[in-house]
Amino acid sequence: MHKKVHGLDLMRAVAIALVVFQHGALFFYLCYGSPVIWTKAGTIGVTLFFALSGFLIGGLLLDLGPSLSEPGVAARFWVRRALRTLPNYYLFLLINVGFWWVFQKARGLPDPAPLLPRYVFFLQNFTGQRAWFFAESWSLSVEEWFYLLFPLGLFLGLRLLRIPFKRLYWALTAVMIGLPVLLRAATLSPEDWERGITKVVLYRPDSIAIGLAAVALFRRFPQAWARLRLPSLAAGIAVLAASFAYMGIGDPDHSTAARVFLPLVVNLGSVLLLPWASTCTSLGGRAFAVPVRAVARWSYSLYLVNLMASTT
């Protein structure tokens, strides 16, 4: 029997804690002028979510392997994925409509009804992130499009082109990492770095794809993966800390290098945590482990509700 990997729970709990912290810090920044750097924590947190999601879903895709060429297998993957994510998403979409009606309509915020078709089909931030309504849903749109298109590429490549699964997996992963970098290099976004780049579907597939690359390396080189767990953890923390400092102190809004490569650097820092997180089977005593597991279990719902709660 395999031991439960608690390090992944800790990584998920840290990710949601950073997101919640950012939303609270944003309130204090707008109201009291607290340091702007604290409003960047969520960028790190969401990227941790993306890397972790890619690692876990990539593992499922590797387990399915060549069987993804069968329509029934591919369909079951999408249905199971949809059942895990869509009910909560659409529930909170409706809750946000009610939230606008009760709290935000009187403040003069526009009626979100014309925007709803975009949210239903995850188009609210496909090419740009401008909508004020249900703002935290941007990352869910990134994930839903990725997990529609990447398995679709596997299905078509296996069934129509007869490409060997591992070669196809790596080719699609490389495209999903490289293409967003090229798109970020080509864009001249008039918006700030966070809204114009990091929250746009077309510019973020690399954040998930790097997790798919990581799990494939884990499966291929398990001994080296375990041996490097502590050096990799230290390097990942250092990279994320440096990225966080730059986002708060530097000027990513007016830097081409930041627009193109900073998301990739944060991706790298996030994925470097995975060798430790994916091999850690104990979090110590129950006083620490139990709340970590609880936060990790409820992280998706916490993500959907915390911004709305903090702006009530």
PLM feature spans:
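Specific transmembrane helices
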Residues: 50, 55-59, 81-110
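Function-critical hydrophobic alpha-helical transmembrane segments in multi-pass membrane proteins
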Residues: 130-152
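Alpha-helical transmembrane segments in multi-pass integral membrane proteins
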Residues: 1-7, 14, 21-43, 57-76, ...
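A short amphipathic helical element positioned immediately N-terminal to and/or at the very start
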Residues: 77-82, 121-122
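Extracytosolic (periplasmic/ER-lumenal) interhelical loops and adjacent juxtamembrane/interface segments
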Residues: 112-131
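Generic alpha-helical transmembrane segments of integral inner-membrane proteins
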Residues: 17, 48, 90-98, 102, ...
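Residues within membrane-spanning alpha-helices of integral membrane proteins
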Residues: 9, 13-16, 47, 53, ...
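Alpha-helical transmembrane segments and their helix-entry boundary regions
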Residues: 8, 76-77, 85-88, 139-140, ...
